[in-house]
Swiss-Prot record:
Entries under InterPro entries matching the protein: EFR3, EFR3_HEAT-like_rpt
Natural source organism: Mycosarcoma maydis
Encoding gene, per UniProt annotation: EFR3
Name of a matching Pfam family: EFR3
GO BP terms in the entry: protein localization to plasma membrane
UniProt region (Disordered), positions on chain: 881-901, 947-988, 1006-1037
Protein name, entry field: Protein EFR3
Length: 1037
C-alpha cells in the first residue's frame, strides 16, 4: 500500500541517497544535488514551509546523532545521514537568508545534535568530520543572522560556547600516558576557530547582548595566541602581518561585508595522509580573528574585550579553559610581562583609530581599582602594558591625558603612603612619563605640569585640605560598574592618609617631581615640534571657511604634533619646595627647575625682534614669567639663611590657599635668634639636626637652577632676582655671623659662605648675560675667596626614579671648614649699590626690557624681603604699567599670601621681625577676616597713580612701636606698582583723583569733623609732604 507523503517531506527525503548507499557516500557525504535544488526552490517560494522542513530535518538529525554515538555499521550509517543533514541545513541557511527566522531554531538544534554526536568517548577520539561540517553550518547561520529582525537567544550562545570550548580543547593521544596529541589538538582548535571566525564576521556578535558573547569569544582567541609554542619575535611579526590584513593563515581572514553579498566558508576536516596544521597556523588564525573582532568593535565592545582579556589573565574567564594534561602546572599569565606588553600593544594596534584609547583607559582603570595590597606580578605587568601603549608608535586620538594622569598619580601616592620604598614606584614613574611621548593637543604638556603641580601643592597643605584634594583626584576613575570599588578605595585612602606622616608626604612629592621630569624628558625625546600659539585672524576672503579651521588657528595647531611650551606660572604653587625640610625633595625640585629652565620655558630674547616675526611684547613675556621667579627667589632666600626648615605644626595649620604662605613665616621664625630649639651657632651640629636645614648640595643645586633661570628668562631674572641677591648677601652677613671660639667649624660660617657663593654665582651670570663687567668682576672676586664645595648634583637622574641620595653634611666638606670668620664677615661682600647701578646702566638690559635706566634703577632698589616677594609672586609684579592693574580674575590672588599676625599690613619688614608669641595670640577667625580680599576707593586711587593723605598713611603702614615708615619705603612701594601713565589720569585738576577728592569720596567725614588726630601730630609726615616724583612710562612716542 502506498502511503502518500506531504510535499516538503518528499522533497527532504529525496535529498538523501538510498539507505543502502548512505555508507558509500563517504568521504564527501553530499546530498543529491538535483533534489536539493528542488527543496531550496520550494523553500524560497514558500518561506513559511521552512518551519516544517526544519522540524523534519531536526528529527532526522536527533535520530542520526544517537546512532552515530554507537559503534559498528549502524554508527557509520548514522554518521553519513547526519553529515548529509548538516549539508542540507547549510545550503538552506545560505540560500534562504531572507527567510531565516523560520529556520533559526531547527538549525541551531541540528548543529547542537551534531556537536554532541562528535564528542570524544573512551572508545574513540572526537569525530573531526562531524565537527567540521557542524562548524560550516554554524558559520552560515552566524553570517546571515540579522539581530535587527532575529533574536540572538540562548541557543546561539550555547553553540558559541561549544565552539569556543572546541577552540581550546586539549585532546589526548592514543596513549594517554604520553599526554596531548599535538596534531589532533591543532586540527580540533582550527575547526573551532573557524566557527568563531564566522561569529566575528556576523552582526550577532555586535548586538545588545554582546557582553555575554564576547566573554566566550575573547578567552578562546587569546588562549591560542600564547607564546608557549612560538617565540615572541614571531608573534610580533605575525601581529604586524595581521594589522596589515595579511596573516600567515588567511583561511579565516575576517572581511565583514553587507548581508546581501556575504559568502560562507566550508570548514573541512583534515584529510588523511596530509601533513596536519602547525601550531603557527593555529596562532595565526587566532590572531587574525581577534584582529577582526577588534577592528569592527565600537568603544563599549572594545572595553568589554579588554576586560575579558584581563579576566582571562586572572584565570577567571567565563569560558572554562582546560588545564594541561601533560603534567605541566598551570602558571599565571601575568608572570610573563613581555608577552603581556606585546598583547596590549597588539590589541591597541588592531582596534580602530578612534577607539584605541579605550584599551589604555581600561587597563589603567583596572590598575587603579586593584592597586592596593602587596606588589605582585599582575601590578607590574599592568603598569608595563600601559607604558608600552603610551610610549609606542600608535596614536591614541581621544585619550583623556588628564584622567589617565590623575589615576596613575593617585595610585603612586597611595603606594607611597603604604610603603615609601614600594617596588612599583619606579615603573609607575616611567609609565606616567610616557604621557609626554605623544602630543594630542597644543596645551597637553602644560596641563600635565599643572596637574602634577596641583597635586604637589595639595600634599603640602594641611591634612584637612590635602586629604580632600587627594581623595577627590584618586576617585576620578571615569567608568561604569565601579561605585563600590570607588567607595572602598576612597575609604582606604583616607584611612591611610590619616595614619601617614611627613615621610610619606615628602616621598610622595619627590615621586611626583620625578614624574614631572620624566614627562618633560619624554616630550623632548619625541619627534613633536614646538610651536608657539598664534591667534590667526581670518580676513574677509576667508570668512567662508569652516569654523573648525578657525578654531585650530586660535589655539596654535598649525600642524599635527605641534604644541605650546609650558607656561612658567604652572609651577608657581610648587616654588616653596626649595625650602622643604626634606633634603631629597629640595634636590629633586632643584633638578626639576633646571630641566624646565633649560629645556622647556620659552626663552626671552635679548635682541629686539623684527616687526614681522615678533611674538608677544617683552612686557607681556615678563609679566607671564616674573611671578615664578619672584617665588623661586623668595624660596631660595629662605633655604639659604634658615637654621631649620621644619615649620611648627601651628604654622602649617594656618595655611589656607597656597604653600607659598609658609615662606614668610619660616623666614620670620629663623630671623629670631632667641627662638627655642634653634641650632647651636657654635657647634658643628649633628647630622639629624643639620639635615633639617640646607646642605652643601642644596646650595650648589639652587645656584645652578638660578643660573639656568638667568639663561632662559634673563629679563625676568634680572628684575626679580637682583634685589633678592643683594639682600641675600647682606642678610648672610647679619644673620649667619656668630662670634665664638668654635666659629671655624660652625654651621653658621659654612652657610654664610655658601649663601654668598649662591649670590655671587647668579650675579656673575647676570653680569655675563648683560655685559656688565663691574658686576662680573665683583662676583668673581667673591667666588675666588670661597672654596668649592666639591659637589655637583647634575640636572636630573638618568634612570628615572632613584632612591634619595645620602646626606652629605657640611662637616664632610673639608675645604669650607678651613675658612674661619674674618672681621668683615658681617659686612656685605658685594656692593649692592654698585650692582644695581651697573645693571640699570646696562644698555643690553635696557634694550631687552625696553625700560630706561631711571625706571630700572627705581625697580631694582625697591624694598625686598620674603613677604614682599611672595606678594609680588602672586601679583606678578613687574615694572610695566599693565602689571599693576590686574584684571578682575587676578585681584583675588593679590591679597597677602600669609597671615598678618600684628594686625597691620604685611608688606614691610615689621612683620618679618615679629615675635612668635604674636602668632599664637591671633585666633583663626581674626586671621580670616584680615585676609579677606577687598577692593575699595583707596585701591582705585592707587591704581590711578596718586593717593590722598589718608591713603598714604594706610599704604605706608606702621612699625610695631607705632612709628610711620620712612618716605623711602613709601616711594619704593610706589615703584613696585610700575610706571604710571599720567596721560590716562587727566590733568589741570580734572583727573579722576581730583574729582574723587572734590566729592570727598573715600574720606571719613565723621573723622574729619573731629579734627586732626593728636596721636599723629608729633610725627613728621615726610612720606606725605615729600612725595616721590612720578616715573616716566617706558613707552613714549
Amino acid at each position: 500500500m502506498c502511503i502518500p507523503k506531504s510535499n516538503h517531506k518528499k522533497l527532504v527525503d529525496d535529498c538523501y541517497p538510498p539507505p543502502k548507499a548512505l555508507i558509500t557516500s563517504a568521504p564527501e557525504y553530499r546530498p543529491n544535488s538535483n533534489e536539493l535544488g528542488r527543496l531550496t526552490y520550494y523553500a524560497q517560494n514558500k518561506p513559511a514551509k521552512l518551519t516544517k522542513v526544519g522540524n523534519l530535518l531536526e528529527s532526522k538529525a536527533q535520530a542520526d546523532a544517537r546512532a552515530a554515538k554507537a559503534s559498528g555499521p549502524a554508527a557509520d550509517k548514522g554518521k553519513a545521514a547526519l553529515m548529509i543533514t548538516l549539508a542540507i541545513t547549510k545550503n538552506l541557511l545560505t540560500e534562504c537568508k531572507n527567510s531565516l527566522n523560520y529556520f533559526i531554531k531547527p538549525s541551531q538544534s541540528i548543529i547542537a545534535a551534531a556537536l554532541d554526536a562528535a564528542q570524544p568517548t573512551s572508545a574513540r577520539p572526537r569525530d573531526l568530520e562531524i565537527s567540521a561540517r557542524a562548524a560550516s553550518a554554524f558559520y552560515a547561520l552566524a553570517s546571515f543572522l540579522d539581530p535587527a529582525s532575529s533574536v540572538v537567544d540562548e541557543g546561539f550562545q550555547r553553540l558559541l560556547r561549544s565552539f569556543a570550548l572546541l577552540a581550546v580543547e586539549r585532546p589526548l593521544g592514543a596513549d594517554a600516558t604520553l599526554g596531548e596529541d599535538a596534531e589532533q589538538r591543532n586540527r580540533t582548535r582550527l575547526i573551532g576557530l573557524g566557527a568563531l571566525a564566522g561569529a566575528v564576521a556576523s552582526d550577532a556578535i555586535y548586538s545588545s547582548n554582546f557582553k555575554q558573547l564576547l566573554s566566550l569569544l575573547t578567552p578562546a582567541l587569546v588562549e591560542n595566541a600564547k607564546a608557549n609554542r612560538v617565540t615572541l619575535d614571531w608573534l610580533r611579526s605575525e601581529s604586524n602581518k595581521a594589522t596589515e590584513g595579511e596573516p600567515t593563515y588567511a583561511e579565516f581572514n575576517i572581511a565583514k561585508k553587507p548581508l546581501a553579498i556575504r559568502r560562507t566558508r566550508s570548514i573541512s576536516a583534515h584529510v588523511a595522509g596530509e601533513k596536519g596544521p602547525s601550531s603557527e597556523d593555529v596562532i595565526s588564525a587566532a590572531i587574525g580573528t581577534l584582529r577582526g573582532l577588534l577592528r569592527h568593535a565600537d568603544a563599549a565592545q572594545v572595553q568589554s574585550i579588554v576586560q575579558n582579556v584581563i579576566a582571562w589573565l586572572d584565570n577567571k574567564s567565563a569560558l572554562s579553559i582546560p588545564v594541561p594534561k601533560d603534567g605541566r602546572q598551570l602558571v599565571s599569565h601575568w608572570d610573563d610581562p613581555e608577552w603581556c606588553c606585546w598583547l596590549a600593544e597588539s590589541l591597541c594596534s588592531w582596534t580602530s583609530l578612534q577607539y584605541r584609547f579605550v584599551v589604555l583607559d581600561t587597563l589603567v582603570d583596572h590598575l587603579a581599582e586593584n592597586g592596593e595590597g602587596k606588589a605582585t606580578n599582575k601590578h607590574l605587568s599592568l603598569i608595563q602594558m600601559s607604558r608600552t601603549i603610551l610610549t609606542g608608535q600608535l596614536s591614541l586620538i581621544g585619550l583623556s591625558t588628564s584622567d589617565t594622569l590623575s589615576n596613575l598619580c593617585a595610585l603612586a601616592v597611595r603606594r607611597v603612603y603604604k610603603d615609601t620604598r614600594d617596588s612599583l614606584l619606579p615603573p609607575l614613574v616611567d609609565c606616567i612619563s610616557g604621557l609626554g611621548t605623544h602630543v594630542y593637543y597644543a596645551d597637553q604638556i602644560n596641563d600635565i605640569v599643572e596637574e602634577i603641580s596641583g597635586r604637589i601643592a595639595a600634599l603640602q597643605m594641611p591634612e584637612s585640605i590635602s586629604d580632600a584634594a587627594s581623595v577627590k583626584a584618586s576617585n576620578n576613575l571615569g567608568a561604569v560598574h565601579r561605585g563600590q570599588q570607588q567607595d572602598l578605595s576612597s575609604h582606604l585612602h583616607r584611612q591611610r592618609l590619616a595614619n601617614a606622616g611627613p615621610e610619606q608626604r615628602d616621598e610622595s612629592i619627590r615621586v611626583l617631581l620625578f614624574c614631572l621630569q620624566g614627562v618633560l624628558k619624554a616630550t623632548h625625546q619625541s619627534s613633536g615640534e614646538i610651536h608657539e600659539a598664534v591667534d590667526v585672524k581670518s580676513n574677509g576672503a576667508e570668512k567662508g571657511k569652516a569654523a573648525a579651521a578657525s578654531t585650530d588657528s586660535k589655539i596654535g595647531l598649525a600642524h599635527a604634533g605641534t604644541r605650546n611650551r609650558v607656561a612658567p606660572a604652572s609651577i608657581l604653587p610648587t616654588a616653596s619646595l626649595l625650602a622643604s625640610p626634606n633634603h631629597a625633595v629640595r634636590l629633586a625640585y632643584a633638578q626639576t627647575l633646571i630641566t624646565l629652565f633649560r629645556d622647556e620655558f620659552d626663552r626671552e630674547q635679548l635682541e629686539r625682534e623684527s616687526a614681522v616675526f615678533a611674538a608677544a611684547p617683552i612686557g607681556e613675556k615678563v609679566s607671564d614669567a616674573i611671578g615664578v621667579v619672584h617665588a623661586i627667589g623668595a624660596a631660595a632666600h629662605v633655604m639659604c639663611l634658615s637654621k631649620s626648615l621644619s615649620p611648627p605644626a601651628q604654622v602649617l595649620g594656618n595655611l589656607r590657599e597656597s604653600p607659598l604662605e609658609l615662606l614668610p613665616q619660616i623666614d620670620r621664625i629663623n630671623a629670631d635668634p632667641g627662638r627655642p630649639g634653634s641650632l647651636s651657632s657654635g657647634g658643628s651640629g649633628t647630622p639629624a639636626a643639620e639635615s633639617t636645614a640646607a646642605l652643601p648640595v642644596d646650595y650648589v643645586a639652587v645656584a645652578q637652577a638660578l643660573e639656568h633661570a638667568v639663561t632662559a628668562l634673563p629679563c625676568s631674572a634680572a628684575l626679580a632676582l637682583t634685589p633678592m641677591l643683594v639682600a641675600l648677601d647682606k642678610d648672610a652677613g647679619s644673620r649667619l655671623t656668630v662670634h665664638g671660639a668654635t666659629v671655624n667649624t660652625g654651621l653658621e660660617n659654612q652657610r654664610r659662605l655658601s649663601s654668598r657663593m649662591v649670590a655671587a654665582r647668579v650675579l656673575a651670570k647676570l653680569g655675563e648675560t648683560f655685559d656688565t663687567d663691574s658686576v662680573s668682576r665683583a662676583a668673581q672676586g667673591v667666588l675666588s675667596q670661597i672654596p668649592s664645595l666639591g659637589i655637583e648634583p647634575g640636572p636630573s637622574p638618568v634612570g628615572g626614579l632613584t632612591l634619595p641620595s645620602e646626606v652629605v653634611p657640611f662637616s664632610a666638606v673639608g675645604s669650607i671648614n678651613q675658612l674661619g670668620e674674618s672681621s668683615s664677615s658681617s659686612s656685605p661682600s658685594l656692593n649692592g649699590a654698585l650692582v644695581i647701578n651697573s645693571l640699570a646702566s646696562s644698555s643690553k638690559l635696557q634694550s631687552a626690557t625696553q625700560l630706561d635706566a631711571a625706571t630700572l634703577k627705581r625697580w631694582l632698589e625697591r624694598d625686598w624681603n620674603v613677604g614682599i616677594a611672595v606678594d609680588e609672586a602672586f601679583a606678578g609684579s613687574s615694572p610695566y604699567a599693565h602689571s599693576s592693574l590686574g584684571t578682575g580674575s587676578q585681584q583675588a590672588s593679590r591679597r597677602p599670601s600669609y597671615t598678618p599676625i600684628n594686625g597691620l599690613s604685611a608688606g614691610g619688614n615689621a612683620f618679618v621681625n615679629g615675635s612668635n608669641a604674636s602668632s599664637a595670640s591671633v585666633n583663626k577667625n581674626s586671621r580670616i577676616s584680615m585676609q579677606a580680599p577687598s577692593t575699595g576707593v583707596n585701591d582705585l586711587r592707587e591704581a590711578l597713580g596718586t593717593a590722598a593723605s589718608l591713603s598714604s598713611k594706610q599704604a605706608n603702614g606702621t612699625t610695631q612701636d607705632g612709628s610711620l615708615s620712612t618716605d623711602r619705603r613709601a616711594s619704593r612701594r610706589e615703584s613696585r606698582r610700575g610706571p604710571v601713565v599720567t596721560s590716562a589720569n587727566g590733568s589741570n585738576g580734572t583727573s579722576a583723583v581730583a574729582i574723587l577728592d572734590s566729592l570727598k569720596v573715600g574720606v571719613d567725614e565723621d573723622a574729619s569733623r573731629l579734627g586732626r588726630d593728636t596721636s599723629w601730630s608729633a610725627i613728621p609726615a615726610k612720606g606725605i609732604t615729600n612725595g616721590t616724583a612720578p616715573i616716566s612710562p617706558p613707552y613714549t612716542s
